């Protein structure tokens, strides 16, 4: 399942980040790394962006970015 498919109110764990190295670096710079727990706070009406809590702070992630983060 991807981060974009996760249900609001759920907590997921990052398994993998798809994409090229520059893209992965940008996602990891946001604090989203393998093994990190993410709480899905809210999804905008059209699914973009997804609001999450990661490492104690709130973050909005674009739908395109969320689709490349594989979670369980």
For each feature predicted by the language model, list its residue ranges.
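Compact, glycine-rich, soluble single-domain proteins
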Residues: 1-72
């Amino acid at each position: 399942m991807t981060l974009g498919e996760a249900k609001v109110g759920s907590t997921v764990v990052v398994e993998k980040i798809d994409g090229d190295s520059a893209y992965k670096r940008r996602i990891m710079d946001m604090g989203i790394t393998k093994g990190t727990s993410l709480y899905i706070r809210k999804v905008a009406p059209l699914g973009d962006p997804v609001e999450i809590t990661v490492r104690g702070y709130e973050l909005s992630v674009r739908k395109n970015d969320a689709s490349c983060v594989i979670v369980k």
